C-alpha cells in the first residue's frame, strides 16, 4: 500500500507504494484513511526538531476515514463507519490512567511519534480509539477533530479550576492563532465566549476574527482567562502581563527552551498557571464527536494530495489556517 515516510538524509517526505498493509488484531479495526491534518508537532518532526524512533518513518496523527475491516472481538457491524482516530493510546493500568488522567500516562503510545503514524492508505488501531463521526460532519470537520479535542480538554480543565472563582471568564485571551489557537477560538465560541486573539501575523488574526474572535488591542489586559497556544519563548511574559489579578493562564503550546519569568508579577497578581496536554480518554473525544458540528473545518486553508506531502509540509507553517492531506476519496466515489 502507499504511505508517506520521512527520510533522514535529506530530511524529506516521500511516498512509497510497497509499505506493508496492516491486519487488524484482536480488539482492533482496520481504517481506510481518507485524510490527515498537519500540526506543529508534525512540522517539528519534519524539520528535525523532534526525532522519530527510526527511519524511514510514517508520519501523521490527525486522522479520519472509514472502517474497512474488524479484528477478532470487534463487532462486524462497525465496518463502514466513518471515524476519527484518537492517536494517543494510554496503558490503562498506571496510577495516572486509573485516576482518569490518561494524558499523563508515562507509557502511552502516540501514533506518528512513538509508533508509526497514519499518513498511509490503511492503519490498524484499537477499536476504542476509532470514534464514529456524526453524519453531518464534513471531511474538513473530521480532519480537525483531534486538535479540536485538545482545545476542548484545555477549556474543560480551565473551567474546573475557575469554578471556585468564575469572575472574569467573559474576558478571555488566546495567544497564538496557528491551527491550535484558531481551533481554541472555535471551541470557546461554541461555549459562548468570544476571545480576544494575539498573533504577529495579520492573516492569522483575520482568520480568528472570521471564527468569532476579535483582535486584542495593543497593551490590552485584564483577562481573567488566558490560553497560550503558541509555545513562543516570549509568550509567557505576554500572558502574565495581560492576565487580570487572580487570572488563570493555561499553557498549551510546547517550548523546550528556557524563558525568563518575572515571578513578582505572578505572585502580586495571584495568577494561576496550568499546563494542559492533549486530552483524557475516553471523555474528551466522546464529548467532541458526540456533539453537533462546530464547524471546525472553517480553519482549513490548504489541501494537498498524498503525492505532494513534502510540498504540503514545507508550505504549512506559512499558511494562515490549517493544512491537510487528502489520502483517498470516500469509498465508491
Segments (PLM) and residue ranges:
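A short acidic, Gly/Pro-enriched loop at the edge of an enzyme's catalytic core
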Residues: 219-226
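C-terminal hydrophobic helical "lid"/dimerization subdomain
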Residues: 1, 237, 282-333
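Mid-domain Rossmann-like dinucleotide-binding core that forms the NAD(H)/NADP(H) cofactor-binding site
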Residues: 137-217
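Glycine-rich beta-strand-centered segment in the early N-terminal region that forms part
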Residues: 20-36, 49-95, 134-136
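Glycine-rich phosphate-binding loop and adjacent beta-alpha segment
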Residues: 233-291, 327-333
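N-terminal glycine-rich cofactor-binding segment
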Residues: 5-23, 40-69, 84, 102-116
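Cysteine-cluster motifs in flexible loop/terminal segments that predominantly coordinate metals
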Residues: 39, 76-77, 86-131
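Conserved beta-strand positions in the Rossmann-like core of class I SAM-dependent methyltransferases
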Residues: 68, 196, 250
Amino acid at each position: 500500500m502507499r504511505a508517506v515516510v520521512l527520510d533522514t538524509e535529506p530530511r524529506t517526505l516521500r511516498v512509497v507504494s510497497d509499505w506493508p498493509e496492516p491486519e487488524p488484531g484482536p480488539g482492533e479495526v482496520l481504517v481506510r484513511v481518507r485524510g490527515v491534518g498537519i500540526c506543529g508537532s508534525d512540522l517539528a518532526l519534519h524539520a528535525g526538531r523532534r526525532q522519530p524512533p527510526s527511519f524511514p518513518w510514517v508520519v501523521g496523527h490527525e486522522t479520519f476515514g472509514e472502517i474497512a475491516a474488524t479484528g477478532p472481538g470487534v463487532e462486524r457491524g462497525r465496518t463502514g463507519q466513518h471515524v476519527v482516530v484518537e492517536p494517543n493510546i494510554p496503558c490503562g493500568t498506571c496510577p495516572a490512567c486509573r485516576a482518569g488522567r490518561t494524558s499523563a500516562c508515562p507509557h502511552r503510545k502516540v501514533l506518528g511519534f512513538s509508533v508509526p503514524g497514519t499518513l498511509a492508505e490503511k492503519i490498524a488501531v484499537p477499536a476504542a480509539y476509532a470514534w464514529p463521526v456524526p453524519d453531518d460532519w464534513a471531511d474538513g470537520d473530521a480532519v480537525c477533530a483531534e486538535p479540536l479535542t485538545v482545545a476542548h480538554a484545555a477549556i474543560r480543565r480551565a473551567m474546573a479550576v475557575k469554578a471556585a472563582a468564575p469572575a472574569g471568564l467573559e474576558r478571555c485571551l488566546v495567544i497564538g492563532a496557528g491551527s491550535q489557537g484558531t481551533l481554541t477560538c472555535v471551541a470557546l465560541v461554541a461555549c459562548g465566549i468570544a476571545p480576544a486573539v494575539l498573533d504577529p501575523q495579520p492573516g492569522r488574526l483575520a482568520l480568528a476574527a472570521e471564527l468569532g474572535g476579535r483582535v486584542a488591542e495593543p497593551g490590552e489586559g485584564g483577562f481573567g482567562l488566558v490560553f497560550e497556544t503558541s509555545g513562543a519563548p516570549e509568550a509567557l511574559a505576554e500572558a502574565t502581563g495581560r492576565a487580570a489579578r487572580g487570572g488563570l493562564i493555561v499553557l498549551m503550546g510546547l517550548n523546550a527552551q528556557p524563558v525568563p519569568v518575572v515571578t513578582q508579577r505572578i505572585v502580586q497578581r495571584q495568577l494561576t498557571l496550568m499546563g494542559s496536554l492533549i486530552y483524557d480518554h475516553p471523555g474528551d473525544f466522546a464529548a467532541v464527536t458526540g456533539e453537533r458540528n462546530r464547524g471546525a473545518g472553517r480553519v482549513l486553508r490548504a489541501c494537498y494530495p498524498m503525492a505532494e506531502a513534502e510540498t504540503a509540509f514545507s508550505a504549512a507553517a506559512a499558511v494562515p489556517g490549517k493544512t491537510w492531506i487528502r489520502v483517498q476519496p470516500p469509498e465508491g466515489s
